[in-house]
Amino acid sequence: MSATRRREKEDKPVLAICYDFDKTLSPDDMQAQGYIQSVYDGDVASFWTESNGMAEKFEMDTNLAYMYKMVDEARGRILLTKDSLEEYGSRVKLFPGVEDWFERIRQYGKQKGVIIEHYIISSGLKEMIQGTSVAKNGAFEKVYASSFMYDDKGVPIWPAQVVNYTNKTQFLFRIEKGVLDVNDSGVNDYFPPEEYRVPFRNIVYIGDSDTDIPCMKLVNLNGGHSIGVYNNDTLDKSKVFKMFNDNRIKYFAPADYTKGSELDTLVKAIINRTASNEILESIHYECKGEWIDNRNDSKKSISKRNKINLIIALDGSGSFATTHNIIGDMLDIEEWTKDECEMLIDIALQNSQVKYILHDKDVCIFYKCILESYGQHNEKTKKIQELLSNGQ
C-alpha cells in the first residue's frame, strides 16, 4: 500500500453529498456572471461558441480551451490574477437557500447520527468557486475543479488541474476511500468494502446536465443516490426527464435549497435512510466477521484431520508407489506443528519403505522442509540429515 494520507473510517456513517456547480448551485455559468462581460466584446454565447470552436479545431479539451480564452481575452483589459478570479467568484449568484443549505443539512445529519460532508466536483474554475460566500464560510470538505498555476505575482501561467465530464468520476473513488489529495496514488490501493470510508451507497450526486452523467451513472450503479435539478424559474425539465428516462438519476427536483423545499425533503429522507441502513450494514459485517472466523476454524479443523490421516497412511505405507503419492499430498501442506514433525521424523527412521527412498527427490524435499519446520537438533534429526546426505 502506498504512503497515503488516507482519512480513517469514522465511528459514525459518513454521507458525502457531491455537487456540480454551474446550474446546480448557481443559475448560470460562473464565468458568465461578470468575468466574460468585462473582457469580451461580444455576447456570452459568442464567447462559448469561439471557445468550443477552438477546442474542435485543435482537438483540445473544451475546458482547456475556455481557460486559455479567459487568459487571452484578459490581456490589455484587466489584470487577471488569482485574487481577481476569486473576486469575480464573490459575485456569482446562488440558487435560493444555498447560502445556509450546507450547515443546515450538516446539522440535520448530526441529529440523526450521520456525518455530512459536502464536495464540489465541477468543470468550472476552482478559484471562482473559492471566492463564493459559501466556500469562504467553509461549506465544502473539498473542491475538485479546474484551476490555474500562478507565478509569484498571482498571475496565471499554466493550467494546474482540468476537470472534465469523464475524469470527474475519479474524485468519487477518492471520496469513497478517503484519499482526497489529487496526486495521491493511494486511491488505487485495494481496500475491503467494509473499510471504505464512504461506500457508494452513502454518496449523493447532485447535477443538472449531460456533463454529470458519468458520475450519476457510477453512483446509481453502486447503490448511491443521484439527483437531477432544474431551474425553478424556467421549469424546464427536459434534461432531468431525459436523465431519468436513461436511468442516470433516481430523483429530480427544482434547484431550490430552502428549508422545506422538495430537494430539502428528499436529501433529509436520504439521511434518514442512511442512518437506518448503516445499522443494518454494521450488523451484516459483524455477522460476516463471525462467519469468516468460523469458516477459518473449520478449515483449520479439516486441515488438522487431513494431516493426521496422511501421517497414519504414511506410517502404514507398504509400497513405494503409495509412499510417493502420500508424500505428494503432504507437499501441498504449508504448515506442520512440532508434534506432527516429530511423528514424521519417527516414521522416516522406522518405516523401511520411507527410509529407503529418502534420497528420492520428492521425499528428500519434503523431509528437508520438515526438518526446517521442526527447528530442533537432536539425535533423530541428525540421523535424518545423515540419511539425506548419504542417499541411504
Report the location of each language-model feature:
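Alpha-helical substrate-recognition element adjacent to the catalytic core
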Residues: S2-D152, M243
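C-terminal accessory/interaction regions of large nucleic acid-associated machines
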Residues: Q353, V363-Y367
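Long, compositionally biased charged/polar accessory segments in the mid-to-C-terminal portions
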Residues: G53, D346-I347
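C-terminal cap/substrate-recognition subdomain and adjoining C-terminal extension
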Residues: P96-Y119, S123-D339, I347, K355-Y356, ...
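Long, low-complexity, intrinsically disordered N-terminal extensions of eukaryotic proteins, enriched
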Residues: M1-K9, V14, S46-T49, I312-D315, ...
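Low-complexity, intrinsically disordered regions enriched in charged/polar residues
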Residues: M30, D41, M54, F58-D61, ...
